[in-house]
Regions:
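Pre-active-site segment of Zn-dependent metallo-hydrolases
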Residues: 63-146, 156-158, 165-170, 237-244, ...
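Conserved, well-structured beta-alpha core segment at the onset of a catalytic domain
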Residues: 114, 124, 129-130, 140-210
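Metal-dependent phosphodiesterase/nuclease catalytic metal-binding core
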Residues: 24-67, 85-89, 180-462, 479-484, ...
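N-terminal chloroplast transit peptides
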Residues: 1-29
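Canonical P-loop GTPase G-domain recognition
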Residues: 725-726
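Active-site neighborhood of divalent metal-dependent phosphoester bond hydrolases
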Residues: 146, 156-177, 543-554, 563-587
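Extended hydrophobic secondary-structure segments that form protein cores and membrane-embedded regions
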Residues: 120, 149-154, 176-178, 318-319, ...
Length: 785
């Protein structure tokens, strides 16, 4: 039965992994036996997630009390390179408004529990509001959330149909609620949908006397938390002679009671009045054509200064509208219709770029090892809200700005993200043995730097994402920028949040110049962690060209052919992106073709390269690696995701640098095989067989968030990649020298990994001994007896 349940789980949720396992097992004369053992070894759905999901389903039917605590928290401030997202935190539940790329990563760093998230509200079906939804959905599924309700604009739910080819969310039920369904209400609050329409559409619809609410691409929300029941004052009950027992419950529930002596005690005499729920509004006007719909909508009137009751006036309005709209006189007029006491929070480009302290903390510590390889990241200060908006109580919302609705109504900024470079450096110096290792590194690297002083400054390799599967606070998912020269760069893969990483590394607006020099994007395969950042990057490049006054030429994107249906669906359901790039099928770039295809030759000429080719690797279907050679003869090979692959070895022969995935440590070779990934030693071996002058390891499992386990196979031609690491040819001899200092810098984390590895080895040895033990052999306990 256990094997059957495992098989059912894989058939339902991991069909691709099942096919790979079957191929691994069925390759010899003992296929039946091997397949039997294979099924027995298959993983079941994680027990903890399964139990949590069952508990959550059961808990949904149980009555819940009204929340005593409600806080609005800015998770993504909407500044340059940052997502924009509002998180509503209550005692029993969480609610999210918009989910841009990088939201999941910020939630992880800032310890925002996602296990209680079941409702996400979208203000506009633009990629900037929902680009982080696929990754977040995978995370909440894995932690046992049974159902996710999506609220608002049309077609938002289509995202899950679009991602079905590379993302499995079968254990997560997706429910869409439309404006026509009426207000949403649960134990915490009631949310009224307010659809907004373009001016022309709105005018025609109103003349006809009807409007398709479910067809709206923009929706505002009026949120009213339920009243908090009044408190029972036990002192007053004692004074009135109410005995302990069920009568107290009756009074608490609002019912008058008669005491045994005939005295009538009214509930209102011993229970304080209910506390009304403070109203908050979430709104976005993405462009001028929606402005009239906002101004003319009567739904807001009852929550502005003209509200019939003071408690109905909005206490806070959260604006996702861009600065270009908020600065229009008509929008300012709408803001001033609210009471002067209403707080207005702007989640847009008024904010600064700082949203994560973790990435800066890591970079400040690594900067001590080499200021050129690990340059400090850029932080742009908030641009500031114009005076007329400030006078209307509008302020830029920074990450972790909070507005407390209950209890103690008010704005809180004590938790806003700040940096403390001195503390980060002090942490590094406090690491055992770090000072000694750093001195040794400086002495050794000085000699190496002199030896390589004549090396060229280009190409430059900037690692933007070095993690596999999901982003973490220290490592983002796959992306590598290669600056071929000052005026030309290419991008290898483009995982979620790649644009955010670029802004941190280059700063704003310098990042615009980098985007303008982007000559090509190479996507190795269509797993989520390798391409979900593409749409945001393409849009940012378009804005950069416009800002710099340059021609808006589409950029070539080489990818598997299924990229075209994906972007076409984005065109139809969200926003047009296909005109921003020209598609090149990776199959047309294959290295082993007798004569180069026209697309390959054109791309080589455009990039002024000597050669550029793709190679099929051993991962999922249509997974590719790439090789490129500059006019000067410098050769780079990029593996993408793969297990050791002979074709990659042949295609990359003689490479100056091999960038190879090393998802797992050597002791997880079996797991790496089943998931078609490579271990560190396997990646190093590929580099050796290829004859690569240097091998750079990347794409680490998040279990190695700080530093991968360094095996005996590491040598003078092997380096380990980190996010925001800049590597030039002259830096290559220095990279292997970093390992002793890195192990000291992350000593606690590294020792923890070593202990886990030792524990796994002991368990394997014990299991091996148990299998070899003959039946009936007395145990040690019996023998001693």
């Amino acid at each position: 039965m256990k094997s059957a349940s495992r098989l059912c789980f894989l058939v339902r949720c991991r069909p691709a992994l099942l096919r790979r396992w079957v191929r691994c097992a069925c390759s010899g004369p003992t296929d039946a036996d091997r397949l039997t053992r294979l099924v027995a070894s298959m993983p079941k759905e994680p027990t903890a997630a399964k139990e949590l999901r069952a508990q959550r389903v059961k808990a949904k039917s149980a009555p819940k009390p009204r929340p005593s605590e409600i806080t609005l928290c800015v998770l993504g401030n909407g500044g340059p390179g940052n997502p924009r997202s509002l998180y509503v935190i209550t005692d029993q539940a969480r609610y999210m408004f918009n989910c841009g790329e990088g939201t999941q990563r910020l939630a992880h760093e800032h310890k925002m529990k996602l296990s209680k998230l079941e409702n996400i509200f979208f203000t506009h079906n633009a990629w900037g509001n929902l680009g982080g939804l696929p990754g977040l959905a995978l995370t909440v599924q894995d932690i046992g959330v049974p159902e996710l309700r999506l609220h608002g604009p049309t077609d938002v739910e289509q995202l899950f149909d679009m991602t079905r080819g590379f993302m499995v969310t079968d254990r997560l039920t997706i429910v869409k609620r439309n404006p026509s369904d009426g207000p949403f209400s649960d134990h915490c609050m009631e949310v009224q949908y307010v659809p907004l329409f373009p001016h022309v559409t709105s005018e025609k619809a109103f003349k006809k006397g009807k409007c398709d609410e479910d067809g709206a691409s923009v929706v505002a929300y009026i949120c009213k938390p339920h009243s908090k029941p009044g408190q029972l004052h036990l002192g007053k009950c004692v004074d009135l002679g109410v005995p302990p027992g069920p009568l107290l419950g009756e009074l608490k529930n609002g019912r008058d009671v008669t005491l045994p002596n005939g005295t009538l005690v009214r509930s209102s005499d011993v229970v304080s009045p209910d506390e009304p729920g403070p109203v908050f509004i979430v709104v976005e006007v993405p462009s001028e054509e929606y402005l009239n719909s906002l101004l003319e909508n009567a739904a807001f009137t009852g929550h502005q200064a003209a509200a019939a009751r003071e408690q109905d006036a909005a206490r806070v309005v959260v604006h996702f509208s861009p600065p270009s709209i908020m600065e229009r006189p008509a929008y300012l007029d709408w803001i001033t219709r609210f009471p002067a006491s209403t707080v207005h929070l702007a989640l847009n480009e008024y904010a600064g770029t700082l949203s994560s302290a973790a990435v800066h903390r890591a970079q400040h510590r690594l900067h001590l090892l080499s200021s050129s390889i690990f340059p400090l990241l850029h932080v742009e200060e908030p641009s500031g809200v114009p005076k007329d908006l400030r006078d209307a109580n509008v302020q830029a919302a920074e990450t972790l700005t909070k507005f407390r609705l209950r209890p103690n109504l008010g704005l809180q900024k004590d938790a806003v993200v700040t940096l403390d470079p001195a503390a980060y450096v002090q942490e590094a110096w406090a690491s055992p043995g770090f000072s000694e290792r750093l001195q040794e590194l400086k002495a050794a690297s000085a000699t190496k730097s002199q030896d390589s002083a004549a090396a060229s400054s280009y190409p430059e390799i900037v690692f933007l994402g070095t993690a596999s599967a999901i982003p973490g606070k220290d490592r983002n998912v796959s992306a590598v920028l290669v600056n071929l020269r000052e005026d030309l760069c290419i991008l290898l893969d483009c995982g979620e949040g790649t644009l955010n990483q670029l802004v941190r590394f280059y700063g704003f607006p310098r990042v615009n110049k980098v985007l303008a020099t982007l000559g090509c994007i190479l996507v190795s395969h269509l797993h989520a962690d390798h391409h979900l950042g593409l749409i945001a990057l393409l849009r940012a490049r378009q804005f950069a060209l416009e800002a710099l006054g340059l021609p808006k030429e589409p950029v070539p994107v080489a990818a598997p052919r299924f990229m075209v249906p994906w972007t076409s669906r984005c065109d139809r359901s969200f926003e047009p992106v296909s005109h921003l790039f020209t598609f090149v099928d990776n199959a047309s770039l294959l290295w082993d073709q007798p004569s180069p295809a026209e697309e390959r030759s054109d791309l080589i000429r455009r990039l002024k390269l000597k050669d550029l080719s793709s190679v099929l690797v051993k991962h999922c279907k249509h997974a590719y690696g790439f090789t490129l050679t500059t006019e000067a003869g410098w050769k780079l090979t990029y593996s993408g995701d793969t297990m050791p692959c002979e074709d990659l070895v042949q295609a990359g022969t003689g490479s100056d640098i091999l960038i190879h995935e090393a998802t797992m440590e050597d002791d997880l070779a079996e797991e790496a095989l089943l998931k078609t990934h490579s271990t560190t030693s396997q990646a190093i071996d590929v580099g050796s067989r290829m004859g690569a002058r240097f091998t750079l390891l990347t794409h680490f499992s998040q279990r190695y968030a700080k530093l991968p386990l360094v095996s005996d196979r590491f040598h003078a031609s092997v380096g380990c990649a980190f996010d925001h690491m800049l590597v030039r040819p002259s830096d290559l001899p220095v990279l292997p020298l970093l390992f002793p200092a890195l192990k000291s810098l992350f000593a606690e984390h590294y020792q923890e990994m070593c202990d886990k590895t030792a524990k796994k080895l002991r368990q394997k040895a014990l299991q091996h001994d148990e299998k070899r033990m003959p039946d009936g052999l007395p145990t040690a306990q019996h023998a001693s007896a």
